[in-house]
Amino acid sequence: INKAIKESKIPGAVLWIEKDNSSYHQQYGKMCLTPAPKSMQRDTIFDAASLTKVMATAPSIMLLVEEGKLSINDQVTKHLPKFKGVQKNKITIKQLLTHTSGLPPVLPLKPEWKGYEQAINLCYSADIRNTPGRHFRYSDVNYIILGEIVKRTSGLSLKSFSQKKIFVPLGMKDTGFTPKKTKIHRIAPTTKEKGKLIHGVVHDPTARAMGGVAGHAGLFTTADDLAKFCRMIINDGFGADKKIFKKQTIEVMTKNQTSMFLHKVRRGLGWDIDSKYSSPRGDGFPKLESFGHTGG
């Protein structure tokens, strides 16, 4: 981390390493360099970007599975009747979770659009690129649709559902969508766009156009809160002295669900097991015995 900071690859970072009952939590460098340098803090809040998929969206879907409100083998049209077409009618929730739906990677930003419902309509009209179940393509569109399924099935927005069912029970007090302005001093900016610093709002342009709440991006969190979430996953769904998920649910989420691709791609339900996106795991995590997520 210090080397990356010295080489100006990153301004700073917060590191959490945990094994058994020991943990290491430390901040490094700066949380921002402009308009004025500001030191990184252990409780700095970050734009979690694509971690939204595995911290909010996929877990919310699986909680609805536990509640008997849907099945991962359901066709998407069962829950979103407007999502239809010759090939689209075949797409299942599982294929959305594993990025094997055949849908495009992103929604078009041109011509310019704005609003959550507009994004959902663009998902409805998106063209299929491959036969569902035949090809792996990391896709934000998959998770935008999953976020809408959470909303339609539960009656709550993804923001409210994940807060109520996951983040509050785990004591993740600094995790959520659309952070309050009172926390702006703790939030690390991301980058500049058209000369303006992106700070306190989601960096992803599609999620921003949707109002900050989307299934693929938009979540903000801290290293401390992320550790609480990961600890719960590792402990078979048990965290903060309560059961968040059934053990079987965690096993299904972290098991290879794309065996049809033989050894080329291994994906769980949301989680990455072995694909071209797995390289950050380094040498410390066994290739087929670990899982994680970075993005695409």
Where are these regions (language model features)?
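Active-site SXXK
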Residues: 1, 21, 45-73, 143-151, ...
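Short, conserved catalytic-motif segment at the N-terminal edge
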Residues: 1-48, 69-71, 118-121, 126, ...
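Residues at or immediately flanking beta-strands
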Residues: 12-14, 75, 135, 176
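Short, surface-exposed loop or secondary-structure junction motifs
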Residues: 25, 32, 86-290
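Generic hydrophobic/packing signal
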Residues: 59-65, 80, 97-104
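Short, glycine/proline-biased beta-turn/loop segments that scaffold the active-site neighborhood
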Residues: 72-86, 168-170
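Flexible, Gly/Pro-enriched loop and linker segments at secondary-structure and domain junctions
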Residues: 292-296
